[in-house]
């Protein structure tokens, strides 16, 4: 289960001293909201508290987190679920925490990679890029008529840095699912499932 804490802070960019950057091999950090389990995304899907608890209790996810291997790309890839190591920009730096407001808060390192440097440049410019989860799973309609991602089938891959996050609050002040106005494509849909039109 995710640890709880009491805060309503928004995602923020943390500048590091030159010494911290060299020691960590990173360009900066993103800290703030990464998911909302009380409200549907802009895509109309709900990612429940149960889904996120199960995700971060998974032994594979824990192993990847412990080894700093939950690596995210600059933008969601259009044609695959797995992460391309040559395109990584961020890394989930520690176990996310649940706020009392239904939001999950996380910390990401901006990596000193080509895509990480692009991301840092955008952040330095003032671009408030969001973060969005990537994974795969089935959906069902809940009792309120919301399309809900099934916690028992969801397979988490990572968080990516995106232009328009599906969770509106998932915007770092210095950087989960992209929102596509033309398709109801769940970036966390199984790769072999056909896209549904809006």
Where are these regions (language model features)?
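Polar/acidic, low-complexity leader/linker segments enriched in S/T/G and N/D
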Residues: 1-66
């Amino acid at each position: 289960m995710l640890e709880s804490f009491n805060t309503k802070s928004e995602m923020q960019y943390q500048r590091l001293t030159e010494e911290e950057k060299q020691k960590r091999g990173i360009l900066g950090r993103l800290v703030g909201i990464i998911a909302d389990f009380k409200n549907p995304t802009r895509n109309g899907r709900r990612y429940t508290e149960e889904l996120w608890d199960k995700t971060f209790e998974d032994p594979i996810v824990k192993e990847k987190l412990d080894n700093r291997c939950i690596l995210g790309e600059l933008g969601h890839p259009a044609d695959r679920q797995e992460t391309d190591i040559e395109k990584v920009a961020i890394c989930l730096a520690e176990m996310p925490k649940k706020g009392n407001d239904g939001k999950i808060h996380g910390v990401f390192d901006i990596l000193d990679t080509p895509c990480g440097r692009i991301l840092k440049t955008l952040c330095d410019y003032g671009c408030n890029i969001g973060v969005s989860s990537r994974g795969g799973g089935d959906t069902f309609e809940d009792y309120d008529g919301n399309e809900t991602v099934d916690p028992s089938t969801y397979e988490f891959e990572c968080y990516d840095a995106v232009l328009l996050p599906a969770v509106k609050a998932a915007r770092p002040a210095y950087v989960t699912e992209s929102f596509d106005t033309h398709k109801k494509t769940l970036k966390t849909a199984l790769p072999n499932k056909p896209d549904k039109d809006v």
